[in-house]
Amino acid sequence: MNKKKILLLSDDLRMSSGVGTVSKEFVLGTINHYDWAQIGGAIKHPDEGKAVDMKDALKEDFGIDDGYLKIYPSSGYGNPDMLRSILRLERPDAIMIYTDPRFWMWLYQMEREIRSQIPIFYYNIWDDLPYPMWNQPFYESCDLLMNISKQTVNIVKNVRQNKPVEDWQCTYVPHGINSD
């Protein structure tokens, strides 16, 4: 059986940022169940324009024989043309974004184009009040909102008023690093 493929849009998982570190945990923790591609963002990314096949690194560094991970480095977080090209090449089953949604303005401007083909998932780290009403259009443009805390679930449900979510669309996925 072929594994589903997820296109992750976040900080490059090889980088040491908090978002990069948690992105790495997502991928390594689920690579036996999913194939992964990533638009890996960084400031002035040294590998921009390359496609980095991580198959050998997965095997050598983590003992993973059947994992698929390809990183498309980007200075910043990509753009519509880059995304369209990667969607054609990788043919993912879903997109998952992770970081402040305001970094993805270009993505949300093309959400209908994307969601007509595949769903958009958002791992949401917003847990501070007051309610970020400016995030309403971002939350409403996602098919699944995975939230780091019960407070974040509360925020999403109070902000996403025009298009209320079903329970399965707004889940609690605890934030943290695998201690194993």
Tell me what each language-model feature is.
Residues 143-180:
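Donor nucleotide-sugar binding/catalytic pocket of nucleotide-sugar-dependent glycosyltransferases
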Residues 16, 105, 155:
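Glycine/Thr-rich phosphate-binding loops of Rossmann-like dinucleotide-binding domains
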Residues 5, 35-37, 119, 143-144, ...:
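Residues at the starts of beta-strands that form the adenosine-phosphate
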Residues 13-14, 43, 102, 127, ...:
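Short, glycine/serine-rich, charged loops/turns that create anion-binding
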Residues 8, 52-151:
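Extended catalytic core of nucleotide-activated donor transferases of GT-like folds
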